């Protein structure tokens, strides 16, 4: 995802985009990747502006991987405690302070709600203007439907970004 963001910045004008108005969003594991981008030192690692991405909207993301070694996925993932910390956005200090909206469905599991709320608080403690959005009537599977048209609540929030 980091290489994709760097590529987008470098090539945005070639396809009519504005490299100074990049925002990212991701759902579930994509929400995790969105969080990882926020801890990227774009200048040091890619020679790009430090505030490369202007806005972040992780949706129902996985921000704290500490529970994973105790889950049914561990035999496949084989996560070490070092890997958990290195790959959990909730433990990675943001490099800069763009606007962030962390969205989660109000009907999602307690764990998704906990992780989204804790990540929002973590960002706020580090000076990031982060907003927590609990979406009524939404769960892990239907929350993403808001991106199907410009009338959904999440799309409206994105459109309001300046």
Residues of each region from the PLM?
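Alpha/beta-hydrolase superfamily serine-hydrolase fold, recognizing
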Residues: 1-162
């Amino acid at each position: 995802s980091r290489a994709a963001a760097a590529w987008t910045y470098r090539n945005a004008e070639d396809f009519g985009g504005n490299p100074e108005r990049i925002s990212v969003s991701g759902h579930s594991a994509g929400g995790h990747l969105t969080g990882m981008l926020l801890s990227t030192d774009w200048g040091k690692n890619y020679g790009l502006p430090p505030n490369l991405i202007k806005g972040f909207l992780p949706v129902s993301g996985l921000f704290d991987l500490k529970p994973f070694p105790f889950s049914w996925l561990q035999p496949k993932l084989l996560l070490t405690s070092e890997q958990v910390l290195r790959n959990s956005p909730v433990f990675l200090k943001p490099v800069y302070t763009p606007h962030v909206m962390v969205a989660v469905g109000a009907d999602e599991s307690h764990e998704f709600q906990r992780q989204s709320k804790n990540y929002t608080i973590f960002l706020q403690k580090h000076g990031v203007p982060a907003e927590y959005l609990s979406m009524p009537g939404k769960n892990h599977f239907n929350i993403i439907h808001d991106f199907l048209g410009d009338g959904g609540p999440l799309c409206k929030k994105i459109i309001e970004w300046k």
